């Protein structure tokens, strides 16, 4: 698959921005806004800090009137759609019809997709708003609120007077600049004829309109602000600006005024277009493109205040003007009306949708007349999308087609996730061409194709990126519709302001049964006969493919490919790193000899040694899969071994290696988002480049006896908080033999126990300083073979709400367990089988003996997940308790959806919900008992506790239409997950 390349940005594209104040769909982003909640709340007269001018009194009266009509818009785009991603943000709008509750703001605020929001008036009254119109091209839209919701403020409206925008006019931009409650920015209009700014590729851009330019230094949050003159009339709409100067761009309000009048008259807002992008070019450039002197003279006489004419910049293939108008053509007239501005073009086209009009152009000095049928802009503006397989699709929009000069047709992937996640770095911009060798020219066809594909089916697809249409990408994808069960059509409803959902298929077709298949392994060739025993070890490797669509236990990855080792080919068991298989809410496929794939499931997750056991049906694999011979003695420093494994390109690698060390260690925790990691490990280290190149493998003797598994551990870089790091080390076979022996008799080790503490190595000097006697030092010197050290308690895990805290304390030095000297992590093995252990320790320079209980690990893995208000909630998994002293509740927020109520109202990831409406929520059962009775669109009070035990109180408004409540739960006494939906 090729890497898509972006087209080079123009100067405008790289320096212009829209003035939202908020965040996009990246996880954990929240709006970084400081708002003075007490502003103007005392009812006293407001004082505005205005620049010194000769008419301050007039401006004072004007601003006093204007601020009552200006609102702060707090909104969220709840899902990806077309060019826009999910986000939570704020902007500005203003009332243009107080009777009907109409608010004018920017189109990029209203957004092309699902919108939820409310407005806050100057006196801090709040009203829910719904979108009723967003223009297909120009940067304006309308929201509507119920005027009855505003009880304490006398509603006022601002008048739209586009003709009053003149060069030199003094203006004020009244809005929420930089997220502040109210900002008033002063400036003067300097231009009326600027071409629309470009904000970049694959995002919304206005075009085919003039923009007004001024220097007002507005920033985030001011989008949608009214630009008013001294009399308080709105002359333009704030839309964007330059990041490298104080320049602001205002939208002329001729089209917003017409749209408002249509809404007031309950008439449709017709919008016409011929799929041509025009640019205003100065006369000198028009001459170079072929404008005749006679035509220039006539235009200058008709329009003495204009500096140029409209020139075709882009003509879309298969559009109304394709083949009739060409790039570089100068527009002279439409329907015998001379043209010099976009304003007149809009007026003519909007009133003639479906009609054929005469266009007169000049091309190379020649006058050409073309009859062109006016198209409907609304018909090429998508108002539907489909969710299926964890991804989202809509018909290709005019916005994207114009950006890349392609026909307005095809299926556009606005959220390439789930089954359709092609590249983690690019979630949007893909055009889907075929699925399972069936063409998908439009959304309706895609729906029918997806209905025919069974669940868990691998199918070929072809697709392209809009930035690299020369390259056709072909990929085999796995259609998963049981974890991500939604297959629905969303249709925009401008009456309710919501998007109406229709389920397209109750259940997918059942998975096809797997048949036994043949495969052949190619043994590793060796010229050295002494290593012939290693040749067949390739038959013990199997490729593991994991799909984990739900980010349970804070696991950051959704798709993984690695290699595992078959530890029992007769019963079908595979050992794999928990870096790649962190939990059992996933789909797993094993690929043998790069030829056949069979499904597998997780049957065992070791709580601390970083490996998982997978089970497959060996009868499906007609190949010579081999169970290797396992050694029974641990590897030691200095021993030579032979490495066989796979690098990050999934290629087989072999090398002679030497054991550089065997260390007692813990994988560094991810402090920002705790997730599973290996602890209390005895790890094998290599002095070889293999140690950084290979994720999976084995260390073997010359005769093929496997001495260690080479696996990957997920942790955090110790010098860079928040940065993932992969630690690649060896796990000695002797640490796994007890589990392998049980697997040979088809017994899954379910009754494993665990000591809830982490240990670290300390030197003899440190131990001596902290109170270890010479007698004990002598004992350690007698029994230690490689390195003389003590183990000390690094941290003790927080107990669950139903447990007593572990009596061990951080800093305790361990001398013996059950009267056996503890010289390394392996000496802690009794914790896996014993209910309690007798520890002899040094605490505060005193030797003492304590009894430490172990815990049953049968319930340590997550078995219940709640999806509520856009938050993924579960009991705090073990990695969380490892880093805490006390757990505030068993209701832990592990992740949140971008654009959901949890994101909008500030529920932090890694926080605990302790109360809902002042009712204590100790666990998920009590949480569900409370929230199931809370109506939709209702404010509730939440009390949270941060990961650092800082209490927080917030309010949240439910939104079950877009974010319904559901659960994933394991059946009682079973490993099967079931979905529970709450309507």
UniProtKB/Swiss-Prot annotation:
The active site is at 108 (charge relay system), 139 (charge relay system), 222 (charge relay system). Residues 287-365, 867-948 form the PDZ domain. Residues 22-33 have a biased composition (Polar residues). Signal peptide: none annotated. Its EC number is 3.4.21.-. Its main location: nucleus. GO terms for molecular function: serine-type endopeptidase activity. Residues 1-40 are annotated as: Disordered. InterPro entries: PDZ (IPR001478), PDZ-like_dom (IPR025926), PDZ_sf (IPR036034), Peptidase_S1_PA (IPR009003), Peptidase_S1C (IPR001940). One of its GO terms (cellular component) is nucleus. Belongs to the peptidase S1C family. PANTHER family: PRO-APOPTOTIC SERINE PROTEASE NMA111. This is Pro-apoptotic serine protease NMA111. It comes from Scheffersomyces stipitis (strain ATCC 58785 / CBS 6054 / NBRC 10063 / NRRL Y-11545) (Yeast).
């Amino acid at each position: 698959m090729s890497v898509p390349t972006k087209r080079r940005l123009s100067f405008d594209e790289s320096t212009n921005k829209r003035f939202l104040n908020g965040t996009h769909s990246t996880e954990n982003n929240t709006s970084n806004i400081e708002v003075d909640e007490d502003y103007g709340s005392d009812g006293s007269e407001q004082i505005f800090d205005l620049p010194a001018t000769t008419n301050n009194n007039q401006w004072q009266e004007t601003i006093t009137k204007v601020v009552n009509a200006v609102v702060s818009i707090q909104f969220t785009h709840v899902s990806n759609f077309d060019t826009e991603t999910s986000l939570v943000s704020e902007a500005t709008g203003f009332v243009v019809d107080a009777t009907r509750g109409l608010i004018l703001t920017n189109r990029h605020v209203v957004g092309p997709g699902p919108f939820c929001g409310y407005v806050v008036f100057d006196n801090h009254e709040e009203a829910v708003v719904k979108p009723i119109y967003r223009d297909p091209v120009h940067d304006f839209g309308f929201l509507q609120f119920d005027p009855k919701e505003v009880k304490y403020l006398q509603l006022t409206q601002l008048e739209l007077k586009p003709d009053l925008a003149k060069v030199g006019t003094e203006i004020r931009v009244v809005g929420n600049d930089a997220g502040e409650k109210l900002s008033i920015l002063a400036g003067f209009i300097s231009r009326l004829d600027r071409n629309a700014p470009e904000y970049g590729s694959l995002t919304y851009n206005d075009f085919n309109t003039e923009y007004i330019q001024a220097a007002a230094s507005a920033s985030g949050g001011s989008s949608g602000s009214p630009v008013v003159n001294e009399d308080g009339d709105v002359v333009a709409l704030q839309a964007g600006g330059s990041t490298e100067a104080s320049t602001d761009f205002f939208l002329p309000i001729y089209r917003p005024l017409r749209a408002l009048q249509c809404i007031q008259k309950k008439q449709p807002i017709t919008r016409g277009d011929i799929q041509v992008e025009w640019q205003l070019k100065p006369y000198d450039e028009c001459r170079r493109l072929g404008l005749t002197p006679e035509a220039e003279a006539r235009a200058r006489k008709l329009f003495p205040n204009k500096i140029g004419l409209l020139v075709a910049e882009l003509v879309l293939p298969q559009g109304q003007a394709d083949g009739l108008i060409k790039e570089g053509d100068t527009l002279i007239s439409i329907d015998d009306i001379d043209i010099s501005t976009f304003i007149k073009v809009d007026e003519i086209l909007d009133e003639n949708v479906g009609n054929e009009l005469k266009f007169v152009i000049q091309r190379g000095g020649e006058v050409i007349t073309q009859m062109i049928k006016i198209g409907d802009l609304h018909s090429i503006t998508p108002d539907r999308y489909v969710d299926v397989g964890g991804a989202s699709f809509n018909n290709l929009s005019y916005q994207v087609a114009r950006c890349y000069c392609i026909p307005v047709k095809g299926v556009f992937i606005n959220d390439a996730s789930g089954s359709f996640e092609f590249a983690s770095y690019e979630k949007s911009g893909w055009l889907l061409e075929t699925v399972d060798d069936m063409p998908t020219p439009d959304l309706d066809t895609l729906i029918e194709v997806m209905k025919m594909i069974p669940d868990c089916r691998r199918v070929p697809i072809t697709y392209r990126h809009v930035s690299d249409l020369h390259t056709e990408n072909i990929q085999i994808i796995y259609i998963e519709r049981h974890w991500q069960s939604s297959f629905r059509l969303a249709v925009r409803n401008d009456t309710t302001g919501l998007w109406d959902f229709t389920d397209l298929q109750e259940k997918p077709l059942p998975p096809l049964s797997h048949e036994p298949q043949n495969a052949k392994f190619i043994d590793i060739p060796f010229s050295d006969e002494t290593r012939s025993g290693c040749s067949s070890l390739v038959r013990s490797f199997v490729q593991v493919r994991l799909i984990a669509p739900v980010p349970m236990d804070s696991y950051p990855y959704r798709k993984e490919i690695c290699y595992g080792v078959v530890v029992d080919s007769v019963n079908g068991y595979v050992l794999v790193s928990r870096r790649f298989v962190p939990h059992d809410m996933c789909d797993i496929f094993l690929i043998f000899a790069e030829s056949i794939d069979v499904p597998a499931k997780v049957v065992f997750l070791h709580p601390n040694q970083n490996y998982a056991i997978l089970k497959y049906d060996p009868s499906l694999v007609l190949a010579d899969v081999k169970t290797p011979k396992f050694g029974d003695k641990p590897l030691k420093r200095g021993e030579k071994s032979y490495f066989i494994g796979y690098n990050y390109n999934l290629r087989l690698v072999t090398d002679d290696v030497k054991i550089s060390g065997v260390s007692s260690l813990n994988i560094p925790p991810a402090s920002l988002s705790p997730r599973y990691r290996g602890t209390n490990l005895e790890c094998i280290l290599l002095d070889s480049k293999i140690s950084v190149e290979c994720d999976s493998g084995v260390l073997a003797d010359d005769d093929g006896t496997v001495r260690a598994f080479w696996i990957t551990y997920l942790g955090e870089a110790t010098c860079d908080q928040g940065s993932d790091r992969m630690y690649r080390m060896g796990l000695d076979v002797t640490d796994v033999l007890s589990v392998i022996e049980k697997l040979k008799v088809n017994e899954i080790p379910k009754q494993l126990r665990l000591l809830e503490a982490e240990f670290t190595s300390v030197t003899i000097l440190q131990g001596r300083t902290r109170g270890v006697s010479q007698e004990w030092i002598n004992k350690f010197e007698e029994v230690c073979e490689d390195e003389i050290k003590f183990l000390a308690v690094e941290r003790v895990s927080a107990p669950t709400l139903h447990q007593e805290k572990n009596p061990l304390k951080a800093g305790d030095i361990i001398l013996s367990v059950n009267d056996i000297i503890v010289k390394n992590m392996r000496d802690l093995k009794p914790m896996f089988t014993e209910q309690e252990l007798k520890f002899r320790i040094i605490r505060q320079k005193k030797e003492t003996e304590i009894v430490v209980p172990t815990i049953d690990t049968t319930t340590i893995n997550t078995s219940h997940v709640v999806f509520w208000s856009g938050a993924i909630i579960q009991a705090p998994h073990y990695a969380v308790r490892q880093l805490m002293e006390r757990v505030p509740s068993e209701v832990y927020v592990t992740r949140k959806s971008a654009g959901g109520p949890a994101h909008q109202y500030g529920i932090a990831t890694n926080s605990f919900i302790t109360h809902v409406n002042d009712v204590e929520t100790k666990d998920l059962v009590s949480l569900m008992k409370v929230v199931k009775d809370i109506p939709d669109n209702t404010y509730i009070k939440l009390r949270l506790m941060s990961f650092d035990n800082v209490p927080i109180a917030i309010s949240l408004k439910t939104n079950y239409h877009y974010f319904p409540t559901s659960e994933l739960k394991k059946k009682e006494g079973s490993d099967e997950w079931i979905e529970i939906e709450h309507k």
